[in-house]
Amino acid sequence: MICILVLITVAAASPVYQRCFQDGAIVKQNPSKEAVTEVCLKDDVSMIKTEARYVRNATGVFSNNVAIRKWLVSDWHDCRPKKIVGGHINVIEVGDDLSLHTESYVCSADCTIGVDKETAQVRLQTDTTNHFEIAGTTVKSGWFKSTTYITLDQTCEHLKVSCGPKSVQFHACFNQHMSCVRFLHRTILPGSIANSICQNIEIIILVTLTLLIFILLSILSKTYICYLLMPIFIPIAYIYGIIYNKSCKKCKLCGLVYHPFTECGTHCVCGARYDTSDRMKLHRASGLCPGYKSLRAARVMCKSKGPASILSIITAVLVLTFVTPINSMVLGESKETFELEDLPDDMLEMASRINSYYLTCILNYAVSWGLVIIGLLIGLLFKKYQHRFLNVYAMYCEECDMYHDKSGLKRHGDFTNKCRQCTCGQYEDAAGLMAHRKTYNCLVQYKAKWMMNFLIIYIFLILIKDSAIVVQAAGTDFTTCLETESINWNCTGPFLNLGNCQKQQKKEPYTNIATQLKGLKAISVLDVPIITGIPDDIAGALRYIEEKEDFHVQLTIEYAMLSKYCDYYTQFSDNSGYSQTTWRVYLRSHDFEACILYPNQHFCRCVKNGEKCSSSNWDFANEMKDYYSGKQTKFDKDLNLALTALHHAFRGTSSAYIATMLSKKSNDDLIAYTNKIKTKFPGNALLKAIIDYIAYMKSLPGMANFKYDEFWDELLYKPNPAKASNLARGKESSYNFKLAISSKSIKTCKNVKDVACLSPRSGAIYASIIACGEPNGPSVYRKPSGGVFQSSTDRSIYCLLDSHCLEEFEAIGQEELDAVKKSKCWEIEYPDVKLIQEGDGTKSCRMKDSGNCNVATNRWPVIQCENDKFYYSELQKDYDKAQDIGHYCLSPGCTTVRYPINPKHISNCNWQVSRSSIAKIDVHNIEDIEQYKKAITQKLQTSLSLFKYAKTKNLPHIKPIYKYITIEGTETAEGIESAYIESEVPALAGTSIGFKINSKEGKHLLDVIAYVKSASYSSVYTKLYSTGPTSGINTKHDELCTGPCPANINHQVGWLTFARERTSSWGCEEFGCLAVSDGCVFGSCQDIIKEELSVYRKETEEVTDVELCLTFSDKTYCTNLNPVTPIITDLFEVQFKTVETYSLPRIVAVQNHEIKIGQINDLGVYSKGCGNVQKVNGTIYGNGVPRFDYLCHLASRKEVIVRKCFDNDYQACKFLQSPASYRLEEDSGTVTIIDYKKILGTIKMKAILGDVKYKTFADSVDITAEGSCTGCINCFENIHCELTLHTTIEASCPIKSSCTVFHDRILVTPNEHKYALKMVCTEKPGNTLTIKVCNTKVEASMALVDAKPIIELAPVDQTAYIREKDERCKTWMCRVRDEGLQVILEPFKNLFGSYIGIFYTFIISIVVLLVIIYVLLPICFKLRDTLRKHEDAYKREMKIR
């Protein structure tokens, strides 16, 4: 018994097993008919699970769905998290229906982001718990407190650093390639040794390769294979033999080459061996020695280690000279082929307008050629009959054989008052000594006058040939019809006088039509609303007309429609037209009863096929007179068919008139009206046949008992009440609208009333205004479309759009107000008033977005809740602790009820969730050298700001290679005016070229540096969707005990449905269900994805941008150019000579700030591959066939297990490629992809130098100079100097310094005093730096920065030092040349310190001494002996003489 009690106690003390995790807090419950499946998920801060607990009541079985959360990072609320798109904290939120979805958060706690350039570490600092993420080439994330460091190890890092609410993207590069360092860091070597090895890797590789080659040659020397090297050594041995025999002094004892430090040998150079030196000397002196044996020496060299060592060094140097380092190689990129997109939508609109454009062009073409032909004809006529044309202005006088101007001409018999005076201005003297003869020049001025007049008329015709004047005639008949009390036949649509008809009227909106009619005094201003309300389509306009129950209103609207479609009834003059389509189709689709029996009758053939219409009027009496006798039903049907066709042909007032005649049984008036229509449109055969048929039917006896269709009663006008029934009132108006006003800038309204007025023209009810204020002096305003809202602060006040009274009531115009005062108006209760309800406001909500917005004229902090409503909230960071994650208080402590703001009031929002701002590196250009010195000496190594000296900011990191170029321009006695230089520069970022500008005589004038600061092509991409791996599945399911599965399973947007029948069986059914092989399990599901990849689509075409800079010693300037537009300024003329075209992919993916390209699904495309599950605007979409199973429980509902919902092929995204040359710039919803490693073409540059008077330059110039320098040694920025030079003359001065100066020669002028120099110093200077300008030494003050940064920050689109270094130095030997010798000598420098000079002198002295002893002395002795021989020979010759 005791054992049993112990067991019971132990069992009671044991915890109840729970799946996924123990404990946890319930965050949401949702009783529902549908159950959720058990899901257990983990996010960055917690674990969450859902489960279903079934309960039964009187109405059935229900599921109490529960969500439970357990915190893993308990203090994450201390960082004050807030929701933001693209945040780096993934949190699973629970919806109201217990569906799970992933949201992203960031911390609101402040965080300082910096980069320690000396240790290459990202430094993050905060005061509380915070979360960081580094994405890009390095990916790291985590929680931290206080300060943390993240080490960078990629050669070039392209990063997006996010910490707290801040995000910064930047580009950073080391001063050396880091692949070697990363490799050695994985070994046992300490970090300092690894860095030293990698810094000296070039010399290490050279020595290692040399040793390997030497070992190989040493091994080969032991075999006969070594003789393969004889072709190499034979030429060397042969040359050495020549030098040996002819240039070296011989030893007196043995006859071999002089050897002061060794004994005489036993072997001769020819290979002979002698025991004594005397025999050797005899052999050499007697001429028996054949000389130096080159072949023997070559064989010895093949076996010797000395030549092998020298050969190994030479081979290693040659190999490394032509081998590119792996780190500086640019791998080839695969180019993706894209198919052409479909034509844009606007092409369809263009295609629809081609016909009208074609007709316009044809007309224009015809008129133009007509004018040309007329001009040619007039020209021919003028040439043939020009005397008749010219006779208009001048006459020929036969008496004096001259031409006289007709203006002011008077006749005196056969003579005139202008005789002896010709039109050419020449006179004939009285003596007759100067005889005048008429010539061509006499009438030239009149021909020119004719030509001028003709051209003026011709040009005037050309200018007005395309002009058109739209004139709308005044509606006199319409005005008359408005004055009639009832409808008349001549006041129906077909008979209205519309005046001139212009086709352009069809394009006018009804607003303009109303303005035209109001201007013609045809309508009142109170009629404008009913006209502007006409639908734009004809069918809608006709329905709108027939909905009006008053003749004057209907007539007004129909007149407006016919003013727009002024050819509507003129189309009836013929047998076709857009306005006849409806009634003709109606006739074709309906059959007359008589035509079924007599299909060959002329009338029936006319109606059906359009045949025999001309004879259809006479075959009624002859062939159909007996058909309708005693057949009233058929009579009624056929006549109603004809009348209905007439109704479809003539809608509006015509149909109303016909309905009136039918209701009055005025058959004669009806026939008279149809005959007037037939008379107006005699050319319409089918219309004429129908009207004749109606007239014929009227003559038959069945007309007395004819019953027309009921729809005609709907077309009858209703009695015109004094006030509309829906606006009726029980008493006279208490409002005095004669005193009404309409004030502006009113946002509140008291005693709101609806107002109705009668139009004095059409009698239409004008109900477009409301009244506010007191009855004695009401204020009237335009009626709001959305009603009015009761104010949340004062319940007697009403507002527009929402309860905050932010919108002004729209005042009516003065013309409208005057019409209201003159019209009959009354007030009624305004029905569209929205009173404040208790459920309209809220204290907290699940936040969708937050930020600061312009609300009307104010700047408010606003929260957008998950229900898409906007609320004022001054906190945006205060959690509602009574709710789950994501619920924020709208007021401090959730104490105040807040009401929604209308979205119309909200504009210019800085959303913090949907549009996060990403900062970039700040570049500060400092003009003053002292300010620059102060900025860089304050040790701002962790700042993300770059400081540039303005005058040298456009210089490259490395001194460029100079080339000589001749100055061009206009040569003068002083020099060259308008001087310029022309050159070509490759459009590649980081390219720099130095120009040594020479005069035409070859004199060096000055140095200029051209630098391509940036060269890239880019496109802007917009986000389509997010995707990622499936982390769980949302499921809702239900079951039926009996019966089939539902045909349509209810599900949410984006969810897939599943079902399985015959699920009920013994032991697998809920309590109370007794079924076997029956029932159904069904439900819906949706994947829960972890958003890891964002997909973007290209929105803009590629934009090529190149920034080219020119830097002189006293100025610098840049220009941005593109391949399309050349740049022409006072300083630059730049254009692309050749252009290379590239394209960026249409769809890209971004993961961890890294671009990926490849096969990616577009939005709405769910094919197999990357991106077939898409999250768009918070909803997840996809395709697939869900796979599910279920577990049976006795007398309980089944446990559904969904194993797969969507087809998610996210693993295919892992095979996407990451192009090395692409860079990414993120910016609030869009990204810009930049490719900066392509040569975009060749730039042709013309630099304008102005006037260079180099011939007046002085050779000797007095300069007063001072300077200031600052910078660092062996760093990225180097040394920057500012020289202040004062001189009275112009001169070209060379620049000399112990450091490498970028500009070797500058131009000094009296007008310019500030000059800037950039230089690279390998030795640390003292407190001053000596710079020689011309012959003047300048002791410039030097301020050095002690920091030695190993990493360089740069903007995204600019090149770094390491890339310029790789472009300049592409081989291993280049690296050895630049760094290797210095590295070898560095240990000795550290050892001897300041005595290094003495050490170097000692070493050089020893080397020189050895060269003198072993090289120079033998040569000198040989020369001395040769000279002595010549002296001895001379003496012997003198003795003989």
From Swiss-Prot:
Sorted alphabetically, the keyword list is: Glycoprotein, Host endoplasmic reticulum, Host Golgi apparatus, Host membrane, Host-virus interaction, Membrane, Signal, Transmembrane, Transmembrane helix, Viral attachment to host cell, Virion, Virus entry into host cell
Q: Which residues are sugar-modified?
A: 57, 490, 1177
The keyword Ribosomal protein belongs to this UniProt entry's keyword annotation: no
Known InterPro entries for this protein?
Bunya_G1, Bunya_G2, Bunya_nonstruc_pro_NSm, M_poly_OrthobunV
Annotated signal sequence range = 1-13
Which stretches of this protein does UniProt put in the Lumenal compartment?
14-200, 327-361, 472-1395
| Name of the featured protein | Envelopment polyprotein
